[in-house]
Amino acid sequence: MEPSIYSYSLCIALPLMLFFGFYFLLAPTPEKAIFNNYLRSRRIMGVAILLLAANYSVHFFLGIRFKNTDAAILMNLSTYFLCYWLFSSGLTTLLDRFYITKCRLRTHICLWILFSILSGIVLLLLPKGGLQTTVMFALAAWLVIYGLFLTRRLLRAYHRVIRIFDDTRADDIGAYIKWLSIFTYWAVTFGVGCGLLTFLPDEYIYIWILSSVPFYIYLFLCYLNYLLFYEQVENAMEDGMTSEEEDLCDTTNREQAQRQDTPFFHAEMAKKIKGWIDADGYIRPGLTIKELSDVLHTNRTYLSGYIKTTYDMSFRDWITGLRIEYAKRLLARYPRLTIADISEKSGFLSPSHFIRLFKENAGCTPKWRKTEAE
């Protein structure tokens, strides 16, 4: 391989990573206490990116790949091990502000130190040949397993938050954090890929460098975009966590009620909900299950249990279904209304969100339905 191709690849990636890393560390955020967790997450990401930039710098300025391939591979694996932890911690912190603890931090740092020591032993003490190569692949396998373990933990936190949003919010707040799921799967593919691509022959190693460019650009843009919605998401998350804690406190009463074939509160609840539906109370934007429980003068936990038992769906899906049916009636009665008007009157966040949900529910777009009504 011509060293220039490899060098040009590093010239493309290194400045971008330095810019992203320092931006994540130093760029300001709104001066509100609620953004402290976002800033912490972004700074963790900045440290991870700068650590990878330092790795790239060693490759660029020292040309270690051409001097000692095994040393370059083991250095990469050790760097990735620490970065896996940093990336997963940065993302998980957005979902659980209490995720990073002293004990957890100490454990993962010790694991990284152990991994690095073993890498040094493999490089310096084991003879070159089949044994050294086998142990290097074993270390790479350990890295992949470690990454998958962190990924599983992150996805569990993500799905827990989505479930809380669906059970407590009528609006699709989860759409604002969907990028976390997308980025996680991309990170798994990229992380495992990097662990394998570092073993590529010299003539193809530039692929390892260039593959990182779109990955970090996407991460950078996601964090910039998420800043716009972070306060709304964090408030919803805090409300949802509080509601979940209330659920735990009310578990005994709920279990006692659910032992009956028809819980004692269902008949009264059904009457109250019917009156609320007849009054079109579900079209109010930003509706939460707590607000509905206050309107119905009932317990939030009982209301949530009633919705799940009676309709076999989450609070958000139930409200969405009611809003879609309301939108259908508007389309039939007032075909001259625009899609944007119908979306707003039905309580949806945006016309695009309304169109997507309408198509999922009705099997056609509201525009087609509107044309048919006309």
Role assignments for model-derived ranges:
Residues 34-54, 108-109, 134-197, 207-216:
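Alpha-helical transmembrane segments of multi-pass integral membrane proteins
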Residues 70-90, 199-223:
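Hydrophobic alpha-helical transmembrane segments and immediately flanking/interface helices
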Residues 57-71, 188-206:
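Alpha-helical transmembrane segments and their membrane-interface junctions
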Residues 152-165, 196-202, 216-241:
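Juxtamembrane or sensor-core-proximal signal-transducing alpha helices
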Residues 1-117, 131-134, 138:
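N-terminal low-complexity or simple alpha-helical regulatory segments
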Residues 223-345, 357-360, 367-374:
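Membrane-proximal linker segments that couple transmembrane helices to downstream signaling/catalytic modules
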Residues 300, 350-352:
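The DNA-contacting recognition helix of HTH DNA-binding domains
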Residues 86-107, 213-239:
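Alpha-helical transmembrane segments and their immediate juxtamembrane interface regions
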